[in-house]
Structure formats: C-alpha cells, structure tokens
C-alpha cells in the first residue's frame, strides 16, 4: 500500500481535555508527513448512532485518507478493533456499528481486518483510551504505507456489528420516523427517504407538519 497523506478524526472526546491532542501527537510521532483533519470531537458521548451518521455524511467529501472514528462505550471489553477497506480509504475504530455506514457511503467494504498486531499499537494500552493507544497508531502506520493485513487477520465483513435499522413506518398519510441527528443549526435528519415521502404523496422540498408531545410545527 502506498500510504496516505491525510488522516481524519471523528470522536466524542470533546475539546475541554487533552484527549484529541494526545491522538494528534501519537499520529505526528509516527507519521509526521500526514495532515490531520478533525471531522468533529463533539459527538454526543457514547452515542454510536450519532457518530455513525456524522461520519457517513462526511467521509465522501474528504480526500483519500485513513478515517479514525472513536465513539466507544464498549472500550475495555471484548469488542474488536477493526480496519475496513472501502473506496479510496481505510476506516479504523471499534467494531460497534460506528464504521459500517461510512464504509457503505464510500461504496461498501472490500476487506476487513482485526487490529491485534502489537507492533502497530503503543507498548502500553490503556483499558479506556484505545483512540490514543490502538486506533491512532494503526492509522499512522497505515498512512506510512503499512499494509492493512499486517495489522491483524482478515475477518468476514458480514461478522461486523451493525446498528439497528432506524424506525420508519408509513401509516396511511403519515410517516413515523426516528430522528437520526440534529445538527448545530437545529436541522433534524429523519430516517425517512424519498420512497417514504412518495408513498404519502410528498416530495423533496414539500411543506409538512411535525407533531411531537410538546406541540406541532409547520
């Protein structure tokens, strides 16, 4: 593998502590040539669905890169760390459903590997900070041209954890849809697409009324 000039980071670490900087520092020590692009560090803590939606919406617009994503409430458990090859990128992070939608947005998973090779992680691995100790080093080594299969054994992509399908039901002339994300500007993304809109006679750009327990808004 030729390596990468870019590494992106998407986490729930926030900016009030040094977690983000620690990941930057580990990457810089191993792959000083790589530029790091911060997608966001403001994912709702532990909200894997939120992180997966933001990542999937963003990575198609980024240059060829190693994309590191860490929203990892299962850190320190038996959950796997993985690297997924997809499109012109490699996605690195926990096997908890976070990475799969992003891989699908890049055209699907070509291959998947479990991150178990100690040579490509820090010598001391914290039970609670795999972003710094496992995922950032793996990404940096990939950026330097290390082949993904050096990081650990190939795994069946169908064995990867996936998130439950968001609720979306067409009920007569109504749609009941789960809220997937609410962005910084208050825009609400629902688990409803063009097919569901067409089923009740609507189209992109149509005016609708939203009802929830606090009231309704057009």
Predicted regions and their residues:
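Alpha-helical scaffold segments in soluble metabolic enzymes
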Residues: 22-26, 54-57, 101, 134-141
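N-terminal glycine-rich anion-binding loop in soluble enzyme alpha/beta folds
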Residues: 4-42
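Short acidic-glycine loop/turn motifs at beta-strand connectors
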Residues: 85-88, 171, 212-214
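Gly/His-enriched, cation/cofactor- and phosphate-binding structural elements
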Residues: 199-218
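N-terminal beta-loop-helix "entrance" segment that forms/cooperates
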Residues: 38-58
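Active-site histidine-anchored catalytic micro-motif
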Residues: 4-6, 30-35, 47-50, 61-71, ...
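Anionic-ligand-binding alpha/beta catalytic cores of soluble enzymes and soluble regulatory domains
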Residues: 108, 122-202
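Electropositive phosphate-/nucleotide-binding environments in soluble metabolic enzymes
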Residues: 17, 21, 45-52, 96, ...
